[in-house]
């Protein structure tokens, strides 16, 4: 579903903003033509291995291998997140001087001013979201379980998910501050536009 949604979104963007998407692909040829497809395929393959290897590894008492597979899956997912944060922040804080953008290397465009702050923010945000998703799934399974043992297990799952979500969410405001501070240091007018101009109501709702 995610792949289909992403493909549809890309198709719409190519039609509606053809010049912009062409420029973005031309600015990050290695990332979009090699890096992103490779990471996406690897992550998908490891995800299927992770899901379908649980029963055989559990029966063979080799849960450690399943944990290692999960760690590899998370590393690939994190790499994909970090890689795509490059073009996202390039649109916000492109390297200066702006008239030399066409002569700047691809890595310099990725490692721009806001790249690492956004990485921090998204890492913490995704960790929080993951914890709460575990909590939601645990609550759903709890409500639909008939056996007492299952209800006790999913009650425990919900508590653990909630604990993870709250614990990881605590530093989220600090990560947001670091990200916005970097934008202000890059160009204060961008920060003013976000915080007190047309985007101010969006920030207030947040």
State the predicted function of each range:
Residues 1-206:
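Polytopic transmembrane helical bundles with strong interfacial aromatic enrichment
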């Amino acid at each position: 579903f995610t792949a289909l949604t992403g493909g549809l979104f890309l198709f719409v963007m190519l039609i509606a903003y053809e010049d912009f998407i062409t420029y973005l692909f031309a600015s990050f040829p290695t990332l979009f033509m090699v890096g992103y497809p490779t990471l996406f395929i690897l992550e998908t393959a490891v995800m299927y291995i992770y899901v379908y290897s649980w029963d055989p590894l559990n029966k063979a008492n080799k849960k450690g291998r399943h944990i290692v597979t999960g760690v590899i899956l998370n590393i690939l997912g994190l790499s994909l997140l970090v890689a795509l944060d490059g073009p996202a922040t390039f649109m916000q804080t492109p390297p200066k001087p702006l008239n030399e953008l066409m002569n700047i290397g691809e890595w310099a465009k990725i490692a721009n001013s806001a790249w690492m702050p956004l990485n921090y923010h998204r890492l913490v945000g995704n960790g929080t979201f993951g914890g709460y998703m575990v909590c939601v799934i645990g609550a759903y399974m709890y409500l639909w379980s008939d056996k007492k043992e299952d209800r006790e297990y999913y009650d425990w799952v919900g508590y653990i998910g909630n604990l993870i979500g709250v614990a990881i969410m605590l530093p989220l405001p600090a990560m947001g501050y670091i990200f916005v501070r970097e934008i202000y240091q890059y160009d204060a007018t961008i920060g003013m536009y976000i915080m007190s101009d047309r985007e101010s109501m969006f920030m207030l709702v947040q």
